[in-house]
């Protein structure tokens, strides 16, 4: 039985066969450009994955997105999110472990999209994201380990180590 797995905001990362890639960028593996209006029937999607995507939207927009995505999921379907963790960044900064410059990318997320520069509009910690997910209809909210996924070999920022990708000496 084929699973419908969607990678939202994938950019250049192509997870390969068995994944649908949706992103506003212009890449060969992209099937749709609109993550705000998924072209799937309600209750038809097994997994929606969005790594470092929702922080580019206002919180009010995100609640609408999350509610829409929830309706697309099958019963027992999974929404897997990765966001910059504000509590970790602030703790590491306050501890003096890293300078502010170390966090400017994860905090503000400057990215070029077509002809525009876009930036993060909000930040999350676990509690704020959990409240938002529950308000959007998600019942089971938990953290997940990037090492235990079938996309663990991709640097998609779910492995957001500081310093970047220093898995030996860095911290999440």
Predicted region positions:
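Conserved class I S-adenosyl-L-methionine
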Residues: 4-11
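Anionic group-transfer/hydrolysis microenvironments
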Residues: 9, 25, 84
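Adenosine-cofactor binding site in Rossmann-like domains, unifying the SAM/SAH pocket
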Residues: 12-42, 145-146, 151, 155-164
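S-adenosyl-L-methionine-dependent methyltransferase catalytic module, highlighting the catalytic core
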Residues: 59-172
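Short catalytic micro-motifs in class I SAM-dependent methyltransferases
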Residues: 52-56
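Local beta-strand N-terminus motif with an aromatic residue
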Residues: 2, 45-46
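A conserved beta-strand element that flanks and buttresses the S-adenosyl-L-methionine
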Residues: 49
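Residues at the starts of beta-strands that form the adenosine-phosphate
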Residues: 4, 18, 140
């Amino acid at each position: 039985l084929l699973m419908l797995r969607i990678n939202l905001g994938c950019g250049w990362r192509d997870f390969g066969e068995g994944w649908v890639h949706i992103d506003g960028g212009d890449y060969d593996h992209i099937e749709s450009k609109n993550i705000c209006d998924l072209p799937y029937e309600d209750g038809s999607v097994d997994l929606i994955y969005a790594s470092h995507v929702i922080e580019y939207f206002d919180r009010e927009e995100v609640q609408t997105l999350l509610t829409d995505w929830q309706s697309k999921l099958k019963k027992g379907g999974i929404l897997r999110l990765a966001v910059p963790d504000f509590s970790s960044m602030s703790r590491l900064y306050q501890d003096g472990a890293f300078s502010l410059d170390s966090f400017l990318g994860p905090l503000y997320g400057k990215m070029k999209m077509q002809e525009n520069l876009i930036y993060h509009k909000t930040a999350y910690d676990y509690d704020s994201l959990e409240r938002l997910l529950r308000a959007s209809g998600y019942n089971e909210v938990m953290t997940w380990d990037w090492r235990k996924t079938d996309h663990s070999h991709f640097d998609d920022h779910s492995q957001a180590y500081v310093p970047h990708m220093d898995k030996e000496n860095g911290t999440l």
